[in-house]
């Protein structure tokens, strides 16, 4: 599956894999770190949603680590291959469409997940690294879950 990710030109990094990386989770850190190393080596554009920045920064502030939250922002804004994508009107409407489509199936997603998936869609991601297998039924992009890497 990592080989498939290596074919990507625009990789969307969802919240779950990023959180596992920051936690240095023993089961997932090596895989996520390896994927990011490969992305830098192959000059793959890595997208993250501003929703993800909100989610990880919230945790930092809850733990009294405001400096860490600002470091996350700095990383997203200054990293060469990483782009923090805003939730604008187009992303919001696409998220509403995805959320409604998912609610009509057994592949439910949360509002935050729909915003993140819409961010990937609107910004042209051809691969999504996530923990949410339900993204597969809602996206034409290659969806790779952490369990698969």
Regions found by a protein language model. Give the residues of each.
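Acidic, PIN/NYN-like endoribonuclease modules and their adjacent C-terminal/linker elements
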Residues: 1-10, 38, 82, 117-149
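Active-site neighborhoods of divalent-metal-dependent phosphate/nucleic-acid chemistry enzymes
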Residues: 2, 82-127
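Conserved glycosyltransferase catalytic-site signature
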Residues: 15, 50, 89, 111-114, ...
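General small-molecule cofactor/ligand-binding pocket signal
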Residues: 47, 85, 144
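Short, hinge-like loop/turn segments at secondary-structure boundaries
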Residues: 63-67, 102-103, 144-148
């Amino acid at each position: 599956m990592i080989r498939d990710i290596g074919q990507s030109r625009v990789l969307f990094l969802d919240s779950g894999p990023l959180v596992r990386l920051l936690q240095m989770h023993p089961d997932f850190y090596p895989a996520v770190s390896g994927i990011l190393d490969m992305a830098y080596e192959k000059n793959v554009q890595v997208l993250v949603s501003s929703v993800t920045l909100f989610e990880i920064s919230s945790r930092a502030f809850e733990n009294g680590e405001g400096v860490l939250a600002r470091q996350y922002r700095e990383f997203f804004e200054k990293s060469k291959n990483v782009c923090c994508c805003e939730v604008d009107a187009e992303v919001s409407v696409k998220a509403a469409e995805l959320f409604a489509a998912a609610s009509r199936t057994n592949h439910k997603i949360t509002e935050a997940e729909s915003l993140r998936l819409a961010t990937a869609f609107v910004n042209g991601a051809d691969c999504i690294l996530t923990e949410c297998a339900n993204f597969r039924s809602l996206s034409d992009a290659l969806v790779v879950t952490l369990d698969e890497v």
